[in-house]
Every structure is written in C-alpha cells, then in structure tokens.
Amino acid sequence: METRATLRGVRLSVDKGRLVADLIRGKKVDQALNILNFTQKKAAGIIKKVVESAIANAEHNDGADIDELKVKTIYVEQGATLKRFSARAKGRGNSISKPTCHVYVVVGN
C-alpha cells in the first residue's frame, strides 16, 4: 500500500532539495524524521513537513501502521523560476532568478 504527499512551488533550489532527499530515501519514517530533525539545512524543514503529511495521509486514508512505513520514493523536481530585476549603476540592470521546486514523497510498507 502506497500513500503520497506533494508540495509544489517551494522557494528552494532543486540541487539543495535533492541533497536532503537523498539522505532519507529508503529509510523507515521514524528514522527519516530523526535524520531531518538534525540536518541543518533549509530543505530539511520543508521535506520534513511533506514526510509528516504523507504519514498522516497513510494513517488517516489507508489505516496504515506507522511503525511499518518506509519512504519508498522521494524526489525533487524543478518548478517555475521567478525572474526578478535588480537596478545597477549607469542605467544597467541585472537579472535575478529565484528557483522553485516540487517535492514528492511516497511512503508504504
């Protein structure tokens, strides 16, 4: 039995999100949450919320036992990039790109 949770449009770089996602892929959910608690990255807090949501979905919608759940798949995909403009000297300008990403988590037995 598989249950999923999704978070889309997160203001986070894809590479930084994947760095944290690789730490918990295939682990039991209690071990994954423990790893995320002690990882000092911005992405860890974001991914922790998605994992907790997937656990709650599994418990509420499917009646799954939390102790047996594992993080089956977790992946971070690139989202839309917010493009901003920064004024510079002598009438010039620089572009600022603010990347977003989508986080997908699937938990199951």
Swiss-Prot record:
InterPro entries from the UniProt entry: Ribosomal_uL22, Ribosomal_uL22_bac/chlpt-type, Ribosomal_uL22_bac/org-type, Ribosomal_uL22_CS, Ribosomal_uL22_sf
Gene3D superfamilies in the record, alphabetically?
Answer: Ribosomal protein L22/L17
Per the record, the domain of life is Bacteria
Q: Which SUPFAM superfamilies match?
A: Ribosomal protein L22 (SSF54843)
- Identify the PROSITE patterns for this entry: RIBOSOMAL_L22 (PS00464)
Which key words tag this protein in UniProt? Ribonucleoprotein, Ribosomal protein, RNA-binding, rRNA-binding
Q: Which GO terms describe its molecular function?
A: rRNA binding; structural constituent of ribosome
Query: What's a single GO CC term here?
Result: cytosolic large ribosomal subunit
A Pfam family matched by this chain, by name? Answer: Ribosomal_L22
Keyword rRNA-binding in annotation: yes
- Assembly with partners or alone: Part of the 50S ribosomal subunit.
Family the UniProt entry places it in:
Belongs to the universal ribosomal protein uL22 family.
Function, please?
Answer: This protein binds specifically to 23S rRNA; its binding is stimulated by other ribosomal proteins, e.g. L4, L17, and L20. It is important during the early stages of 50S assembly. It makes multiple contacts with different domains of the 23S rRNA in the assembled 50S subunit and ribosome. The globular domain of the protein is located near the polypeptide exit tunnel on the outside of the subunit, while an extended beta-hairpin is found that lines the wall of the exit tunnel in the center of the 70S ribosome.
The record's HAMAP family line, in alphabetical order, gives: Ribosomal_uL22_B (MF_01331_B)
Q: What is this protein called?
A: Large ribosomal subunit protein uL22
Organism lineage reads as: Bacteria, Pseudomonadati, Pseudomonadota, Betaproteobacteria, Burkholderiales
